[in-house]
Amino acid sequence: MNITAEEAKQIMDSEEGYIILDARTQEEYDEGHIPGAIVISHEEITEKAEEVLTDKDQLILVYCRSGRRSKIAAEALLELGYTNIKEFGGIIDWPYEVE
């Protein structure tokens, strides 16, 4: 379930069909996020996940600011029946491009 930022970047560069999930607030997302990420705050994940993330077997890469909220979101997704969740911590440790 936990991977490094480097492993997440490698997946983003070499695979297709994954989702990057930003578990921060919309305001934080608007200030800067990993390219291609969608935002569902960790507080809204149980209400919005099944509407937005329709394939429970799709690879979902989850991050937040420091890693705490991404862990909460990843655990919530697993409890909802999602099977392919990779949590890679916080954007503060992301050494790659943001937008």
For the regions a language model picked out, list residue spans one by one.
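Rhodanese-like catalytic fold shared by cysteine-dependent sulfurtransferases
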Residues: 1-18, 26-59, 65-99
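Active-site flanking residues adjacent to catalytic metal/cofactor-binding acidic residues
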Residues: 21
